[in-house]
Regions:
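Sec/Tat signal peptide C-region and signal peptidase I cleavage site
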Residues: 5, 15-20
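Repetitive, compositionally biased segments used for assembly/scaffolding
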Residues: 20-137
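Sec-dependent N-terminal signal peptides
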Residues: 6-10
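Hydrophobic alpha-helical membrane context
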Residues: 14-15, 61
C-alpha cells in the first residue's frame, strides 16, 4: 500500500492535484483519497483513516507516515521528479512528456508504469505493460 501511494503522489506532484482527489482500483472501487490543506497533502485509506502526508518543499515534497516519521522525498527539476527514500537514496524517477503523459522508472531506468489524464480530468494509471491499474478523479 505504501509503495502504491508513493507512485500515486509522484504523479500528483506533476499534476498539481486539486483540493480533493479520490483513487479507484481497475474495477472502479474506491481505494483511498487525498486532500490538500495549504502546503500539506493528507492521505486516507478507503475507510477515511489517515495513512500519511506529503509536505511541500522548495522543489518538491517530503513524505511522512501517519506518525509523522519521514519516509522519503520527491524533488522536481523541469519535467522530471526523482524519488528518494528516507536515507536519501534514489528510488526512481517520473518524467512528463509534451503530451502530459507521465512515465515512471525504477532506479535503474526501467519503465514501471505510466499515467494519462483525459479531457474530463480523470487520470488513469497503467503498469509497465499498458494494463490499467487504477484511476484518480
Amino acid at each position: 500500500m505504501k509503495k502504491f501511494l508513493a507512485v500515486i503522489f509522484s504523479f500528483l506532484i506533476f499534476a498539481n492535484v486539486a483540493f480533493a482527489t479520490t483513487s479507484y482500483d481497475k474495477y472502479g472501487q474506491k481505494t483511498g483519497s487525498y486532500r490538500q490543506n495549504g502546503s500539506t497533502i493528507n492521505l486516507y485509506d478507503r475507510y477515511g483513516q489517515r495513512t500519511g502526508s506529503f509536505k511541500k518543499t522548495s522543489n518538491g515534497y517530503n513524505s511522512y507516515d501517519k506518525y509523522g516519521a519521514k519516509t522519503g522525498s520527491y524533488k522536481t527539476h523541469g519535467n522530471t521528479t526523482t524519488k528518494y527514500d528516507r536515507y536519501g537514496s534514489k528510488v526512481g524517477t517520473y518524467k512528463t512528456n509534451s503530451s502530459g503523459v507521465t512515465t515512471s522508472y525504477d532506479k535503474y531506468g526501467r519503465k514501471t508504469g505510466s499515467f494519462k489524464t483525459d479531457s474530463s480530468g480523470r487520470t488513469t494509471q497503467y503498469d509497465r505493460y499498458g494494463r490499467k491499474v487504477g484511476s484518480y478523479k
